[in-house]
Amino acid sequence: MKIGITGGIGSGKSFVCRRLARYGIEVYDCDAAAKRLIRTSPKIRQELTTLIGCDTYIDGTLNKAAVAQFLLQSDDHAKAIDAIVHPAVFQDFEESGMTWMESAIMYESGIYRLVDKVIVVTAPLEVRIDRVMQRDHITREKVLQWMQRQLPQEEVRKRAHYEIINDGKADIDAQIAQIPEISKYRNLGISECRNNGISKHRNNITKRKTI
């Protein structure tokens, strides 16, 4: 059984993933993996350089200015980069042997096809906006621009199997404990836990209708 965790920007999905560590659950971070692969994969480096230009990497480091300029030239350019990076992340996750993964673009990227169940972390719009403004020190308008690049929260809620509400008031741990795919790990032995992608350490969940 493989589980995906998603949520729009500012929803607090990474916070929920950190709470899962209390159950000994290790979560594969798709965003971190993408950054690592862009930096280390010879295949990705070659394909991005062919796509963007010879100044894509400077002294082995991704030239973010060149990438940003490339993205501004056409809406299709982001899709072209994704077509290079996403398959590599999919393969890396499959080869990792891990059974839990976190992705902000679970459905947009198609990586949801690699998991059996999806948990969505949600929060009210204004809460999300405020979190991102404080975290990244950016304007409200910039946050809204980023949000527009992701599926609407309500659409993701409809597709996900479970929902964890992270509005700053709801008990996160109580909601996590209610998810069957988490509670079943409580009595696993150490060796079995490791084989399931978790370490030796090991109520108000909303179940969503699958679409």
Where are these regions (language model features)?
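Hydrophobic anchor at the beta1->P-loop junction of P-loop NTPases
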Residues: 3-5
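P-loop (Walker A) phosphate-binding loop of NTP-binding proteins
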Residues: 8, 20
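ATP-binding Walker
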Residues: 11
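Walker A/P-loop
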Residues: 14
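Residue-level signal for inorganic ion chemistry
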Residues: 31, 81, 100, 143, ...
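ATP-dependent small-molecule kinase phosphotransfer cores
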Residues: 32-98
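NTP-dependent small-molecule kinase module
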Residues: 94, 112-121, 125-138, 152-211
